[in-house]
Amino acid sequence: MAERITDEQVADLLAILRTDASVDAKANRITAVKTSIKQHNVPATCFAPLFEALHIASTAQHPVLVNAGFTTLNHLLARLARQDPKFLAKEAPHTLPVVVDKLGDQKDKFRQIAVQALTTLYKVAPVDVERSVRNIAMVGKNPRAKEMSMHWLLQTHQEQGLQFRAYVPTLMELLEDADGSVRDVAKTTVIELFKNAPNTAKSDLKRQLKNFKVRPAIEQVIVKELNNPSSSVSSHQNDMMDLDEPVMPTRAPAPASIRTNLSASVPTLASERPLTPGLDSRPEPVEPQFVNTQRELDDIFRDMHMFFDGRETEQNWLKREESMTKLRRLIAGNAVSDFHDSFLAALRALLDGIIKAVTSLRTSLSKEGCALVQDIATAYGPGMDPMVEILMQTFVKLCAATKKISSAQANATINTILGKVSYTNRLMQHIWMACQDKNVQPRLYATEWLTTMLTKMAHHKNQVEHTGGLDLIEKCIKKGLADANPGVREKMRATYWTFSGIWPARATHIMNELDLTAQKLLQKDPHNPNAHSRTETGGARPGMGLSKSVMGAPKPSVRDAIIAQKRAMASSKNQPPRPGSAMAHFSPVGTTRNVSSTSQASVASASTASAVPAPTKSAFGASSGGLSGAPMRPGKRRPEVAARPATAGPYSVRNEVPPAEPASPPSKPRIKTVTSPKTQTLVISPKKAIPRPQQGHSTNSSESGIPIPVSGISSPTKPTSAFGLRSPRSPLAPELPPSSVIASPSRVMPDPAQIPLPESSPSKDEELSLVVPGSVLPTQKTPSPTEESQQPQIAIVPIEAVEIVPDSPYRSVQVYEDPYTAGQTQPQSTYTSPVLEPKPVNEGAATSPPPQPSYDGENGHDMGEIPIPSSPERTRQNSRLLDSGISKVETKSLDVHGFRKLQGIIRDPKGGAIFTDDKFNALLSGLFEFLEAHPSEIPHVPAEKQQDVKAQILATIKLLLKKMRENFRPHVSRGLDSLLRARAAYDSRSHIVSGMELLADELITLGDPTEITLVLANTLREALLDKDQQHNTAARSLSMGMHVLKEVVESSANSSTPFTPTEQELDTLAGLAAKCLESADSAVRMDAVQLCVALHAKVGDQRFWDAVKREGVRDDPKSLITYYIVRRQREVGTNA
């Protein structure tokens, strides 16, 4: 252990350092002194000579001596800071030059020791240290010294609270330093120093950046980082790692060949150009800009006002556009949240300038002005009501502009305003004026505005009816349906059906006033929910099969179709005429029509089976089939232009006994199945026709690759009950007696487009062949006459056996081997017998068919379906994700993305087994508590995202209700109670309110009316007690509670267990209604009146008025209730 340092040792060290002794000897002496300093206190008499000796060593030229001396000096400073800080404070001015000089040393070790020495000296002499750093290190010429001094400044500020205001001018100069690394360090230092500074300091920093003319790139980075503190700290996304894992794989995009074929079924309007892409009227997103003080916000608006004075010129138009963009950036930033009222007042003061920008002839300036108004409407909603009148006048006028961009932007802006602001009758008057405009554009846009208003006010019909808006809506619809422009009429038909869903009686009256042609067009509109043509399927279209040889084929054009038809006609002329005897024969192989060469790419051919070839339709001809799914009258048969070839099949199948001479085989040899000639099978096969031009009446059929389940027809060879795609290798079908063959006098097969499939099938246009054995048909349920009349008459033609491999519509699509490539690997038989020789069909099939699986026609799947078991790994993953989601729901920390992952787990058909009763109850209880939680009780979710989280909670509850309806039944009352409590936090104009009301209406049909009435009565009594303290929130809960109780009373009339209130329940409901009739809120009073009307209709006149009398309702509310009761009785009598 080293001994304590002595005066003689220090004197010897000082003497040897002044001589020419070797460097090693000097370094050894200094090391010995350093060891003593580290272990023992230093005598006071040694302070001064020891500092002198270490100064000499630290400033020497040899690096070994410098290393030993400077490290010893650092230890000496640390020792004296604890032993004698007063002496160290006196010695600091002499030692600081050496330390500051080492801040710029080439070696990083010495620079780090210098920072430590400065930190030690700052504790005893802060003024001297700050002066040396600020006036020497930071303004010197050494870039390393500048960097280290800024590091020391930041470290000292974070650890010891150093006030850095005096360093700001120096930092501003360092931001423009010639050295790039110095600029980067200065930028980082400024950001870290001002990150947690008050708003006034940040505002001063922005002014300093402007005053020192810091380059814009650096200024923007600093301001952006200061305005977004979350970007500089690590986010908490790792907490959601459990729920961020993918649950379901994303679906790959459809191939290009399939996407091109999808356009074949889209109807084309005469007033539209479907090939021209529409204008994108959505505003472009902007970078947010943040303000820190009210003074800074006032300065921004004060500078803007001068740009909007006078007329638009070449000098100020760009400043106006930049001002619009800056206002949008402020809205995207914190101006709305931190300076809500003052920012709105400043916008109102600048409204004249905003209108000048909107009406500018410069498209970019007008576009920015429209985007600004949309952002204001989205951010403030009803808060911008005072500005709506002048804005509506401006934008309605702008919609008639000749510039398409300006017109489309004005239309989008009006749509946004109508969807966000409060409803007034003036808005409907603006729409009515637009419907009467001489230009077609405002009339066309008015249909969209009217749809927006109808969608928004669907749940607030009373407000529209009492202000005269309903009459204006009817006038607008009548005017649009009779408009001279076909595009306006087409758009107004869609609006009419939206109106019909809200006021059906009024809509029926409007339709009755139209002429017959207009009524037919209105009923055939695709937006008509009652149109049957939308649920019927069209025929399979080219390219929709799963065969890679078919899917890879390009879509043939109309020109190819014409050429193919001409070739078929020319080839038919060169063939000898067909014998008359061949016309009357019935081919057991399958009757075919004249098929052109272009239709040979049909998917009906397989390796071991073939379907009936579909007829080829001319590009300009009519056919009984096609892409339209609606039943239609068959077109006239075209006259024969040439004699039919001798080997062609008959035109139709006649009711005759099958002859011994069959028709000629197809042109290409196929693999034959050796079967009995007596066996015949019913086959339904979609045709493959040449595409033709779109027709106005063609339906928009869905194009999908999912198998189609068909009710009542099952596979004869497999006992499984789900339907799927047909297998390329089909086993033999069972025998069918000849008596089961039914021939059609007009055609062999009905067009697949005219065969309606069940509504439960997930896809409409699939290649599907159905095999129904005749031996099974007698064992099936005998259809009623009504069912027989609804089923199409399908001709049964003999054909080679084709089998359907059952599968569930929810399973993933299985892609089988291409029949064309699969056929190459199998030995093909050669026809050695004459062409017209009788062929054995389906011989040797099974004699006893397997039992038929039970089929659920309502749900569209088999009752005996057994789901594919999921893998243990998948089950464990889902279970872990579910547990994580439940825990985060209970702690109210689950965000929007987490809820979406949770919904994916619930939707997973293979993940339902992980939902035990305990997990289901825990999840549902947590969701209800999360839903009704006050915003202050959800600290983990930002305030601006809480409404989105609540919307996801509603979506999750609805999904649980849909998937596990019976498990949900005990929680109905609790759910309605949570909805009422959550309703108190949101205004009626909020989009989440409509979701709450829809969920409440669905829960009513599931729960017990008596229990619901008891629970809601207790909740509403609490709301009535809180009315004085929180009037607005209590009124919202009361309004929704009255509505729910009214629905309980009314909906029970249509249920299997009607609800008749007892005397006690009637008194409870009447008492609540009586108290709500005294409310200061008009919506609460109106809902209470509606509840009274429903009670009167339910319990009768005598019981109702007795209950009202017992509750002591005043005369004025009684008169109002009587008025609405009489009004309802009249409406019921009129509808009856």
From Swiss-Prot:
A UniProt-annotated Pfam family: CLASP_N
Keywords, sorted A to Z: Cell cycle, Cell division, Cytoplasm, Cytoskeleton, Microtubule, Mitosis, Nucleus, Repeat
Pro residues: bias regions: 659-668
UniProt HEAT repeat ranges: 95-133, 167-205
The keyword Cell membrane belongs to this UniProt entry's keyword annotation: no
Subcellular location: Nucleus; Cytoplasm, Cytoskeleton, Spindle; Cytoplasm, Cytoskeleton
InterPro entries reported for this sequence: ARM-like (IPR011989), ARM-type_fold (IPR016024), CLASP_N_dom (IPR024395), TOG (IPR034085)
The keyword Nucleus is assigned to this record: yes
Cellular component GO terms, alphabetical: cytoplasmic microtubule; microtubule organizing center; mitotic spindle; mitotic spindle midzone; nucleus; spindle microtubule
Superkingdom of the source species: Eukaryota
Low complexity biased stretches: 595-622, 701-716
Biased composition (Polar residues): 673-683, 777-793, 822-833
GO biological process, one term: mitotic spindle assembly
UniProt-recorded Gene Ontology molecular function terms: microtubule binding
Region listing for Disordered, in residue ranges: 524-554, 567-794, 821-884
Functional description taken from the UniProt entry: Microtubule binding protein that promotes the stabilization of dynamic microtubules. Required for mitotic spindle formation.
Assembly information from the UniProt record: Interacts with microtubules.
Family: Belongs to the CLASP family.
Protein name: Protein stu-1
Organism of provenance: Neurospora crassa (strain ATCC 24698 / 74-OR23-1A / CBS 708.71 / DSM 1257 / FGSC 987)
Gene encoding the protein: stu-1
